[in-house]
Amino acid sequence: AKQDADFIRPSPSGFGADGGSFGGIARRSRDVLLLCEAAGFDPILVETVGVGQSETAVAEMTDLFMLLLMPSAGDDLQGIKRGVMELADLILINKADGALEAAAGRTAADYAHALRLMQPRHRAWNAEVLRCSALTGAGIAEICAKVETFGEALRGSGELAAQRRSQAVLWFNRELGLALMDRLAGDADLAQRLKTLERKVAEGAMTPSAAARRILA
């Protein structure tokens, strides 16, 4: 990092008890977030590997979800999954400079219109669309101010604390499922039974729900 107070940590790409990834983030990303928060880092930014319906788990571990997009000719709106937009607290249209400035304005207007047709994610906050330029720095100060306003609004309404409690329970259940799979994979007999049941499911000889009950019997 260029600044002494900054800390940048790439997530591991390996699979297994300490690795793996799902939803655009590594399995232990939330643990790292909690550790960094306890160490006094604020704010903490999480960058995902991309945008897609399956890459939204980051919204389940962060306070604010940003969707970063580029200017388009107006036909890319349909390409963004509705589920991703519904999770966004801020939608940022980058590259709002030079020859793309006008296109960025049109793209921002398109997404602002789409947001008005969606149910707000929070009682105390309506998602907004902002334009910015990483090249010139335009709009960055406004984004930072909006982030602060978002935090104040959700803390004041009590939604931030409630959201964090809900996230903790969600990640407990998710980690429990992964831990059970780790246990199954680590037991030779159970692992063999699991492979047999997977084959039966693939062949259509057994339904997934029946196979799951069988492995737990």
List the predicted regions and their residue ranges:
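Nucleotide-state-sensitive switch-loop elements of NTP-binding domains
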Residues: A1-S54, M61-L68, D75-D76
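Conserved beta-strand segments of the P-loop GTPase G domain that flank and frequently precede/overlap
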Residues: S11-S13, L67-M70, L92-K95, R131-C132
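Short, acidic/small-residue loops that bind anionic groups at enzyme active sites
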Residues: L67-G79, P120, A124
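Residue-level signature of catalytic and energy-coupling elements of molecular machines
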Residues: S29, E47, V84, N94, ...
